[in-house]
Amino acid sequence: NYPVQLLLEPLIGAIAGGNVAVLKPSEFTPHVESVMVRLIKEAFDSRYVSVVTGDYQVNQALLDLRFDYIFFTGSVNVGKIVMEKASHHLTPLTLELGGKSPVIVDETANLKLAAKRIAWGKFMNAGQTCVAPDYVMVHHSVYEAFLKELQTVIKSFYGDNIQSNPEFGRIVTTRHASRLADLIEGNRDQVVMGGAVDLEDRFIEPTVFKEVTLTSSLMEDELFGPLLPTMSYQSMDEIKRCLKAHPNPLAFYVFSENKAFSHQLITQFSFGGGCINDTITHVASSRLPFGGVGSSGMGRYHGEASFKTFTYEKSMVNRSTKIHLNLVFPPYKDKLKLIKKIMK
């Protein structure tokens, strides 16, 4: 996702820290890859910044080399491979991964605004955003009203013929589109909006699912597409049970006018970052370090955090030569009384 931004943003931090860098763009976006190769060659001396292209075999060969630092953005499974390879050389690294980022909507939330901001965060880039809302839990007393608002918002965003709307994107590969299509077909009975698929066009319609359970295939892995499972809840225990089944998400979103409720959620559960009464926007601030925790990644970047990621602090002492205390040097026998007096 975002192959230009996710290549250049870490590079800025690396250059700011005085490093040379090797870039490896995603092989799933070949046109972007070719453009980036050209631009990087035009802008940088290859002794300082170079680009390597190729498939997973090139990735494996690259990871066999010794680097001072590795920065990886991608899936959890590939992140594990990168970390295992880095361990051979004890290379420090940052992993920007993903996970099932939840949205919690309570009974005090502004439903119209919640629906709009959730739909915007979910369906931009056809759902292919690492911090996109992955599923929504809504208080049972406002669940049906929320679903109605959500459907209204999606229609207002993209119209009746979403496939012909140039503002709605496509899935990056046919393989990923097929994966999403299978999830839709396997959960067709719970679709309340959307569900259309055109694999040749790599089009997956924004699709909303109703009353999804924790055992559903939709709740197994990060969806990374325009599929939005929803479920109702009645108690905090139900929320906790769901969040514990999918721990350490990259993002966490709460929609509520109840400050105590929001505070309870964001302090009790571990996640990378998030928003109260919004989605996605925490990523846009250069003042806020961005990154995951646990299975959603490790390390932080953006703004000053990027500089800190690609540098390390050296602890140094510069002693004066004008003053010299013989007290610290042996033999200590004659100095013991003085030392005890000082220590009192």
Predicted regions and their residues:
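ALDH superfamily catalytic-core signature
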Residues: F44, V78-T213, I276, L338, ...
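Conserved C-terminal structural/oligomerization subdomain of aldehyde/semialdehyde dehydrogenase
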Residues: F203-K344
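Alpha-helix/helix-capping structural signal
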Residues: V76, S141, E257-A260
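Short glycine-enriched loop/turn motifs at secondary-structure junctions
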Residues: D64, L97-G98, T129-V131, S164-N165, ...
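Residue-level signal for inorganic ion chemistry
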Residues: G18, V49, I70, G99, ...
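Rossmann-like NAD(P) dinucleotide-binding subdomain of oxidoreductase/dehydrogenase enzymes
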Residues: N1-L113
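Short hydrophobic/charged patches on amphipathic alpha-helices used for structural packing
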Residues: N59-Q60, A115, K240, H263
